[in-house]
Amino acid sequence: MRVTRHASAPGYEPPAHHGVAAMRLQGHEAGPTERFWVGLSYYLSGGGAGESPAGEETVYVVLDGTLVVTAAGQEAELGPLDSVHLPKGTVRRVDNQSARPATLLVIIGTRQEPS
């Protein structure tokens, strides 16, 4: 069992993000995982993730606040405990259009080597 305390979770800077503070809870800098990694992102008002393809299968779960996710010509406003699944390669965008911060749990698959 490997525990990552919020206070000691390593931060990272995701590409094409602005007004976002991100940390890894499991995987990568937080310790090895086999099939996925988990992050926590804080989106300030006006913050967002620019349009880019999901590098691997991705799930977002909004923990607090609201975020607007745009993908494949669809737009969805997500509130607390709402989630969205993005298949690998889906071009997506995330925006905090509200006046308050939002917290997002991020689960992303890792590249699997062919067996």
What would you call each of these model-derived segments?
Residues 1-35, 115:
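A short, N-terminal "cap"/entry segment at the start of jelly-roll beta-barrel domains
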Residues 23-27, 37-54, 88:
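Conserved short histidine dyad/triad with adjacent acidic residue
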Residues 30-34, 43-48, 64-66, 110-114:
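Short, charged/polar surface micro-motifs in flexible loops or helix N-caps
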Residues 49-51, 69-70, 86, 92-98:
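Short beta-strand His + acidic residue motifs that chelate non-heme Fe in jelly-roll/DSBH
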Residues 55-67, 72:
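Glycine- and acidic-residue-biased ligand/ion/polar-headgroup-sensing regions
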Residues 66-68, 75, 91, 101:
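Structural motif
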Residues 73-88:
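Short acidic-glycine-tyrosine-enriched beta hairpin
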Residues 88-114:
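Ligand-binding loop in jelly-roll beta-barrel domains
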